[in-house]
From Swiss-Prot:
GO BP terms, alphabetized: base-excision repair
Keywords (A to Z) from UniProt: DNA damage, DNA repair, Hydrolase
Gene Ontology molecular function terms on file: alkylbase DNA N-glycosylase activity; DNA binding
Alphabetical list of HAMAP family matching this protein: 3MGH (MF_00527)
Organism: Clostridium beijerinckii (strain ATCC 51743 / NCIMB 8052)
Protein name: Putative 3-methyladenine DNA glycosylase
InterPro entries: Formyl_transferase-like_C_sf (IPR011034), MPG (IPR003180), MPG_sf (IPR036995)
């Protein structure tokens, strides 16, 4: 069942945890890819120096952050990679959730070829884990780029999120990664992941 628009009206800190275990659906190249979300980070523009929307900073690039919850925000980094975020909360709040890692559920050969130009059974165990264990890695594997920016994740199209299996798991809360510039926000425990999942980017 597709998650409805109301689900995304939750604040980023709540949504970042609620998204764990949910299933991303991506239809591309004639295949339907499925993956479980296993790691997220919350960003809250009003108080968070790590956020693109800190202190109400609003630009053409960051505009998706100020839209109503439930759309995709995809941005470009280092001149070659993409990161995928889910916008949370109400319009003009400037909040979002970075999706840091997926657990692939199907089409393993397709994903392996996208990431490493190899069949899945040719990969080492390390490479198998590395297919989607980071924000840019999962974008490569799932063909997520700027064309997904602003897409409504509650509409059944080629990119949306479904309710996952009713698994029981423990959520680990810890510091976010790669935000050394963010002063006191460095220490905010706003990264969340499923304990014991082998696809998380970093313990």
């Amino acid at each position: 069942m597709i998650l409805n628009k109301e689900f995304y009206k939750q604040g980023a800190l709540i949504l970042a945890k609620e998204l764990l275990g949910k299933v991303i659906i991506r239809k591309v190249d004639g295949v339907t890819l499925r993956a479980k979300i296993v790691e997220t980070e919350a960003y809250i523009g009003e108080i968070d120096k790590a956020s693109h929307a800190y202190n109400g900073r609003r630009t053409e690039r960051t505009e998706p952050l100020f839209r109503e919850g439930g759309i995709a925000y995809v941005y470009f980094i280092y001149g070659k990679y993409y990161c995928f975020n889910v916008i949370s909360g109400l319009e003009d709040k400037g909040e979002g959730v970075l999706i840091r890692a997926f657990e692939p559920l199907n089409e393993f050969d397709y994903l392996a070829k996208k990431r490493f130009n190899q069949n899945y059974d040719e990969l080492s165990e390390t490479k198998k884990k590395a297919i989607t264990n980071g924000p840019s890695k999962l974008c490569i594997a799932f063909s997520i780029d700027k064309s997904e920016n602003y897409k409504r994740l509650y509409d059944e199209g080629d990119f949306y999120i479904e309710e996952g299996e009713k698994d029981t798991f423990k959520i680990v809360e810890t510091k976010r990664i790669g935000i050394d510039y963010a002063e006191e926000a460095i220490d905010f425990p706003w990264r969340f992941y499923i304990e014991g999942n082998k696809y998380i980017s970093k313990k």
